[in-house]
Amino acid sequence: MKILVTGGAGFIGSHTSDRLLELGHEVVILDALTPPVHRGGVPPSYLRPEVEFYEGDVRNEELLRNLLRRVDAVYHFAAYQDYLPEFARFSDVNVVSTALLYQIIVEERLELARVVVASSQAAMGEGVYHCPVDGEQLPGMRPESVLAAGHWDIPCPECDGPLAMQATPERIANPQNPYGMSKLGQEMVAVHLGRRYGVPTVAMRYSIVQGPRQSVFNAYSGACRIFCLHYREGRIPTLYEDGEGVRDYVNVDDVVDANVLVLQDDRAIGNVFNVGGGVPVSTREFVEVVMRQYGSDCPARVPGEYRFGDTRHILSDITALSKLGWSPRRTPADSVAAYARWLEDIEELDGVLDTANASMRSLGVVRKVSQ
């Protein structure tokens, strides 16, 4: 097949493109090469020469229409992710581009084998918790006043008792930030229009994806990037809150395995799938993995800072995708080792950490507990 990969010069998109080429498919990439992922408007050197590359915006109707007419399937990875309060841009890039994609498919009566849309674990927000008294709970975003007082764990909204984190299934949709809201909107556009108009669609809710090619320039996202850059430079990273917040890390090669599976397996059509690591890992545990990779005995600092809007815990339930035969095979240590090796060949690292830290503080993302 000839397959269009939007955002194909990025992290997940480029790895997926590589695998598709290895499987004998032809790959067409559409990417705007915009910051913070890319700098200088130049395609990254890791792109394979076999790909047919177009620099352009996925919202460019004429360009997108011309490309869609020539392909048999689509992976839609192009997205906007940041912590800036650009609410309209989140929806415009993530939701409107997806609506345009389906509009063209329907108008042109294109018979595509598959459209795979990249969603995010952020669509689930804090996810699902269990209270021994009141049962399942879906807490909202933690109030600023609570975080400023240094209270991290979420009490039951009904009885104020303790809550236990649960693995969150796909039926839960409770986004708490503009990015998560836009990804849920994207899911709804893709899955519902796909069902209505007979477009074989799959939406993939990725957890925190780790591995080589994750941009070093994104100030907000990427625990692997942040911690590896610190220890590589002999600096000590910061853990927010108490370092015990749980995250769900998945290796990019496992993600690619899942992406290829849903292209090939018709049982995936019309569904949303969580794509996660399946194992809860605290931020403190993850930074210890990075410490071991760099042979450091200097633990991260815990200075009583937090990022307003962060979830306390989140773990995706990957049962649904596992029923199709997929399971994550790589560990966080595998991801860290691969990323650390990749960093050795990156030359543009001077000032990256300082710029990112300054940006986070100037925007008020990082805040201190009240004394």
Predicted regions and their residues:
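N-terminal Rossmann-like NAD(P)+-binding domain of SDR-like oxidoreductases, especially those catalyzing
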Residues: M1-Y206
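Short aromatic-enriched loop/helix-cap "lid" or pocket-rim segments at secondary-structure transitions
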Residues: R39-V42, E126-C131, Q214-N218, F286-E288, ...
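Residue-level signal for the nucleotide or nucleotide-sugar donor/cofactor binding architecture
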Residues: R59, P85, V93-V96, E170, ...
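CheY-like receiver
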Residues: N66-R70, I104, H230, A258, ...
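Conserved active-site helix of classical SDR/Rossmann-fold NAD(P)-dependent CH-OH oxidoreductases
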Residues: T98-A99, L184-V191, C224-C228, D257, ...
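Hydrophobic pocket-lining residues that define ligand/cofactor binding sites across diverse proteins
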Residues: I105-R109, G194, Y231, L239, ...
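A conserved pocket-lining segment of Rossmann-fold NAD(P)-dependent short-chain dehydrogenase/reductase
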Residues: D160-N177, V199-V216, I226-V250, N274-G276
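C-terminal substrate-binding subdomain of Rossmann-fold SDR/epimerase-dehydratase oxidoreductases
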Residues: E233-Q371
